[in-house]
Amino acid sequence: IQEKLKEYGETDIQIKIQKSENKHVQSGGGQSPINRQPIPGVKHIIAIASGKGGVGKSTISINLAAALSKDEKVGLLDLDIYGPSLPMLAGIDKQPEMTSEKKLIPLEKYNMRLMSFGFINAENAPAVWRGPMVSRMTQQFFEDVEWGELDYLILDLPPGTGDIQLTLVQKLALTGSVMVTTPQNLALLDVKKGADMFAKVNTPVLGVIENMTHF
């Protein structure tokens, strides 16, 4: 991941990947162990997160996925239910098909398998949903999408530490997360909250990307 990110400019990127074989994770708050499940056929799951919106997280997600896809089998899942960006970033305006087992088939472009709530919300209507419904939709994207064999699944999370993020870290066996921020003090405070959330459930933060540094 570190080498792929360097292809997008001269910058100092420090990323350390830690591999954990234990799926039962003890949270930092002393809670009961969490049984986090892998996605069948997916080797590594990387969450791209931010504490604040508008920091370029979705742009970094698709560029990182595209760079990895040159040598690896890669999927990209846009989990921002309220404001999905992947349809516009990928230039896709169609709905995914379903298998005979009623699983969604990811759309393919740029040698990547792509899935977003924006692909199935044909009317582009705003999602006015409460937390429990959002959590169920998030879980469906893990269980009811036919990802096939992947080396990496990149997750583009919505900003903050809300229901989607909590559902994710509690139920999914993440390889790690990458935090995206900007130099402003408010953004840095929020990204620290996000990093603390991952730390409490022993999900390693692989790196922090400071975006828009020269603006």
What label would you give each PLM region?
Residues 44-78:
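Walker A/P-loop phosphate-binding motif and the immediately C-terminal alpha-helix
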Residues 13, 73-74, 205-206:
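Hydrophobic anchor at the start of a short beta-strand
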Residues 151-152, 158-215:
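Conserved catalytic-core segment of NTP-binding enzymes
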Residues 54-63, 84-87, 160-165, 188-190:
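Short glycine/serine/threonine-rich phosphate/pyrophosphate-binding segments
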Residues 71-129, 135-136:
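Phosphate-binding loop that captures ATP/GTP phosphates
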